[in-house]
Amino acid sequence: MDIKINKKKKALVTGGTGFVAGWIIKQLVEAGVNVHATVRDPSDGAKVGHLLELSQNSPGSVTLFQADLLKAGSFNAAVEGCSFVFHTASPFILKFNDPQRDLIDPALKGTQNILEAVSSSDSVERVVLTSSCVAIYGDADECAFVPNNMLNESIWNTTSSAFHQPYSYSKTVAEKEAWKIAEAQEKWSLVVINPSLVLGPTVSGKSTSASHDICLQMGDGTMKAGAPPFEIGMVDVRDVADAHIRAAYILDASGRHIVSNESCTPMKLSKMLQEQFEQYPLPKKELPKWLVWLVGPIMDKSMTRKVIAKNMGHSWKADNSKSKEKLGIEYRSLNTSIIEMFQQMIDEGSFKKS
């Protein structure tokens, strides 16, 4: 499905140094769009240099703006003159001290602040929000109780909280707030992208996203004794970026969109890597659930026995037909995604050969 991108209309991408944001910006500037990108510190060359390089080597341009998710009004300058806003900025961290402070407040207040700036603008036509599949479900065992045992866009996560799966809770409350704000006005439309676990290389060449942790643990020996038996949806980052852009420029796009290629396990990912990267300590077997239940909380405090019981050994399925039919997404092979991701992490020295 071909889409027409209006090069004369500017676009804003929040969280410009993020994993998904980098690819959205790259695709937009290569199409000739002038992009505003918000970052924490525009003067930090180590973190924003790749964005400036995109601006130099593409028909479009990137202009950086400083913004803080928690600071009201900090997005106003970046929004000015933009027709499309891609709100990707939200904390995705697996280790934190205070879930309310570190995850929930930035996700919720950041969404409120960017949409307040959007509503104050006269130029914005559409907002594309980066939500997540975890705004649809809380734990994998819930798949057994939904129609056809398959997650769909009509389902909402009702089981996560600040104390159980707080990241999932942060994405849920942020998306609900976005819909509440969008439905209370008529100046701009909202389209939501709900990706599963995002894999693939980064635009910056630096593996900084929590999405890279699974790859890191397979390559650094953490999973050498075996991989945990959990299944989750996975998708290439370039497909997620493509979905955002299509959601912006396809006029009749609406609602939520599950963007997930297929369900997979760490062990299946390891098998994809073993032929090409056999010199690394990749897991060769899957651990039994009882063993993960026993030692998991000792190894990782966020891996509670409740999380293990409700997510390990359960089937995970999601219906991605809307993303294919309404957005025209053609998914890349996960084999390509994980190999390119792993190779990039080797190139930057993330782990050593065994």
Regions found by a protein language model. Name each.
Residues 243-306, 334, 339-354:
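Mid/C-terminal beta-alpha module of Rossmann-like enzyme folds, strongest
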Residues 184-188, 200-214, 247-257:
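Glycine/proline-rich active-site loop of Rossmann-fold NAD(P)-dependent oxidoreductases
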Residues 296-328:
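Conserved C-terminal active-site "lid" loop/helix of NAD(P)H-dependent oxidoreductases
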